[in-house]
């Protein structure tokens, strides 16, 4: 698999979260359900001050390595702390979307960036192949950034960033 090493700036994201694990395929089910809620309940559309049209799947709060529990956040990037605060107040106080909305910060730093084309199956295949590779990971934040380049999910471009030391 080809990749490049990149330095990224901090990103403020807003979305919904679920703790999961890769054990027994649990994450596949949990992540799929979280995306359905994020898009299907109108959470994505309700978030104001989005930086762009891209969606992000964030892996964070690792309790060890990829075999241990972690949190997955279906989210999008917002422009500023002010946008973050407004969204948290409006969406949680008014219970606008029926889900608890959270904010996370994807830290600035060094990441291995992979680019794949495809849908959920191809993203899953990427992770199974990636876990066989030897990377000195930070286990702080990894994320998938969906480029929204097409309505055909089988041709979607996805940038996957793995936090590395």
Q: Model-derived features: where do they sit?
A:
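A solvent-exposed interaction/effector surface
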Residues: 1-165
